[in-house]
Amino acid sequence: MKNKRFLFIFALICITIFCIIYYIFLKFGNNNSKEKIVDEILNSFNVYEADVTVTVYSNKNTNNYYMHQIVNHKVSRCIINEPEDINGLNIELNNGKLFIKNEKYNIEKVYENYSEVLNNSLFLNTFSDDCINNGYKLKESEENEVNNNENKDEIIIETILENNKNTYIKYKELYVDINNRIPKKLIIKDDKQKIYTSIIYNNVKIK
């Protein structure tokens, strides 16, 4: 009788230990798998094309811009489609220089230190660099939290620019479709976590 009881307790302990080890392994495996996927996603932003809708928020009004982005490693270019008054404006970042062109208004300028003129946070490769330099963490989407969605088709990659002197650009959150690994939107927040810029991505082509 004592032997049977001992064997039962021993078996119960073994099962409990197995369950704990399995849970830890499963959790670690999922986290490791997600981190690997995120690294692959961030590395894919070096070469891509996309149609983007940029919304800039301020205390007084909201401005929308529609543009096409072309990124090839260190060369980042966007062509403004709307609003109409700046249609055709071509902005290119190349080797630390900013090129601004608009044939309609016969404009062509080159700035040696573009960081003082234009922040290049609009581009996905800049987001990748920010994650490399500042680290990142994965957040749960509000939809998954509310609906307790176990599929989790969307992941949110957040990076915090602690040393950025521009108080309007402190937090960045990139929403990515986990199935096709295509970015959906980028939210940029100020130092008070108020949304400063929203960027919606359409027709994204990762090359």
Regions found by a protein language model. Name each.
Residues 61-67, 85-93, 167-169, 194-197:
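Amphipathic hydrophobic-ligand
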Residues 136-207:
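Gly/Pro-enriched, hydrophobic low-complexity segments
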Residues 2-74, 205-207:
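N-terminal leader/targeting segments and the immediate start of mature chains
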Residues 54-56, 80-83, 100-104, 161, ...:
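Beta-turn initiation residues at beta-strand->coil junctions
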Residues 45-49, 69-76, 92-97, 150-152, ...:
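Short, solvent-exposed coil/turn segments at beta-strand boundaries
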Residues 115-116, 120-129, 135-136, 140-141:
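C-terminal low-complexity, charged extensions that often adopt amphipathic alpha-helices
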Residues 58-60, 71-73, 82-84, 178, ...:
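A generic beta-sheet turn/junction motif
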Residues 68-122:
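An acidic-aromatic
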